[in-house]
Amino acid sequence: MKKKTWFLNFSLFFLQIFTSSNALDVTQFGAVGDGVTDDSQAFLKAWEAVCSGTGDGQFVVPAGMTFMLQPLKFQGSCKSTPVFVQMLGKLVAPSKGNWKGDKDQWILFTDIEGLVIEGDGEINGQGSSWWEHKGSRPTALKFRSCNNLRLSGLTHLDSPMAHIHISECNYVTISSLRINAPESSPNTDGIDVGASSNVVIQDCIIATGDDCIAINSGTSNIHISGIDCGPGHGISIGSLGKDGETATVENVCVQNCNFRGTMNGARIKTWQGGSGYARMITFNGITLDNVENPIIIDQFYNGGDSDNAKDRKSSAVEVSKVVFSNFIGTSKSEYGVDFRCSERVPCTEIFLRDMKIETASSGSGQVAQGQCLNVRGASTIAVPGLECLELSTDMFSSAQLLEQTCMSAQSVQPRTTTQPMQDPIWVFQSRGKQLRVYNIAILVSFISLVTYILAR
């Protein structure tokens, strides 16, 4: 009998070696999940346990529960690589009156290699109490220095300011998100990207009070596709060059996106007095539905009022090598194309091809007009008022540029494979310990071994 007991204990030990994982549920660390109790410390304890473990770490936010969190910082670097966050429940921020701590952001992940956040959970920033506030307002979810980052499947609601901010990250994939805030909510950008490279954003539905996506300085190799944007301010490059900033943006490809009732469609915006460049940018395959400014380059951006930008300086961010291709749909205003560039630093190599933008109000298929200032380039179509672009049927340069830009952006691939951890097929729990089995072959082998021992 003692021999059988020893064999059973050995078998359990053997199974644990081959099937154990660092998968930790926040409720194991005291999280209540009633939407009222502050669960911040429980989340930090769970994170510390996952981050300091070995192997693949999994941080689980269970379904059917709502966790109220004060501002939190999830710090790397972690021994566990990759780190999986399985977001199945709901996170809610405190109201402005109950806010404690950092007002720059609500949730921050920093210095983490191979972070994967997936699930059908919800992140609610409770931003309505902040939107009338004139001072600083927190971004809901921020990632800083997180390389090989994946974010997928979540719903993001009502951030006090921007919903998601990506900074100093390399190799990022964001997909299948739903981001929603009222059209009247100020500065509630969907996704902001700055000082980052090799970023893919795809198949997201975004409705906000500001830019659906904003690409800021220090970015390169950005591929955006399958975005449904509206309401909002469109997909923007910038703003760039504020307060004399030297800005750099290059190799950006925006493809197959829809804009519905937005203030802008495809936009590049820079401040006077800045320097640097925005170049190798392509917007291709864009559908427009009653968009105020379908295509706009604005080198006189002034925080929203370009017409009154009186401080016109001798320097500006250089905008060049930009292709707008395959646009179809309607403009809310009479202008489908609006280019306003600096006399000292004009926009160059700007190409329009294969587009049909009509005014929504006319109802008669009237072609939307264009206006331009200090722009050099070419167009395959005659847009009324857009005489600054040379009319040409030979657009080999623009076709080359479009292909080169989108191929560079599409070549973005993570350096390491970070596949999400599967749900366990069998869970054994005893005396507060939990054993999870993920492989059916190992489970069958274990059952056969135990059966053999007991039969002897």
Curated annotation (Swiss-Prot):
Q: What is its main location?
A: secreted
- Which InterPro entries does the record associate with it? Glyco_hydro_28, PbH1, Pectin_lyas_fold, Pectin_lyase_fold/virulence
Q: Which reaction does it catalyse?
A: (1,4-alpha-D-galacturonosyl)n+m + H2O = (1,4-alpha-D-galacturonosyl)n + (1,4-alpha-D-galacturonosyl)m
Catalytic residues at 210, 233
> Where is the protein localized?
Secreted, Cell wall
Q: Name one GO molecular function term.
A: polygalacturonase activity
EC class: hydrolase
Q: Where are the PbH1 repeats?
A: 169-195, 196-217, 219-239, 249-270, 278-299, 314-341
- The EC number(s) this enzyme carries: 3.2.1.15
* UniProt keywords, alphabetically: Cell wall, Cell wall biogenesis/degradation, Glycosidase, Hydrolase, Repeat, Secreted, Signal
- The signal peptide here is 1-23
Would you say which domain of life the source belongs to? Eukaryota
What Gene3D superfamilies does the record point to?
Single-stranded right-handed beta-helix, Pectin lyase-like
Would you identify the family this protein belongs to, as annotated?
Answer: Belongs to the glycosyl hydrolase 28 family.
Q: What is this protein called?
A: Probable polygalacturonase At3g15720
